[in-house]
């Protein structure tokens, strides 16, 4: 990865909080009832939505260009503690998110994986450091974070890094430039779940969104690299918008044409 481009403080965007009300969504799959829970805070700025027993999507509502925009990450419930994929817009939301999930699961957040150096991903880095939570990132993301005025994450992730948190296997992958120079994706091989982050657009997205730091001419190649590496995908979590499947990657390619 080249380290010569300064990212502007941009956003990918978010929705999260404290545990105040629970709504249950029922669906029938293979003649078996599956309960999926959504937990929100009082103000609706923070929510966590269940994908399966051990994987939840966290969503925070942040502000970008004067508009409220929801931003997604993950909560991984492992045998050794909780792991987040991305923090939130700022320290206030990140603190509230951490308190919310630690109360829900009765476990401590031990690690966070930062997928790039925009505010909606790394905005809570100060809170992470204050709480002794390990913030994993690529070296490029750490460098760009410092340039953008944030405290540095660890910079310990390579092009491909395989991690294990208790019973949870996690792979991080740098597919190339796209939404930013440093964007990575996160793969959960036990569930075939891909966290596309802001590299991947939701089906409701009509354009590429914030492209202040984008490499539009290289973005398609990076999406193709993800498709080549992960051929059996059950679910894709975009940086913003609804969870989908492999079709989100194909939709992103269409937007890039």
From Swiss-Prot:
Query: What gene, per UniProt, encodes this protein?
Result: blm
Q: Which residues bind Zn(2+) 1?
A: 116, 118, 179
Q: Give the protein's recorded name.
A: Metallo-beta-lactamase type 2
Q: Where's it found, cell-wise?
A: Periplasm
Q: How is its activity regulated?
A: Inhibited by captopril stereoisomers and iodoacetate. Also inhibited by chelating agents such as EDTA.
Q: Which organism is it from?
A: Bacillus cereus
As given in the record, the signal peptide range reads: 1-30
Q: Which CDD domains match?
A: BcII-like_MBL-B1
Reaction catalysed by this chain? Answer: a beta-lactam + H2O = a substituted beta-amino acid
What lineage is this protein's organism placed in? Bacteria, Bacillati, Bacillota, Bacilli, Bacillales
One cellular-component annotation, GO: periplasmic space
Q: How is the cofactor bound?
A: Binds 2 Zn(2+) ions per subunit. The enzyme can also function with only 1 Zn(2+) ion.
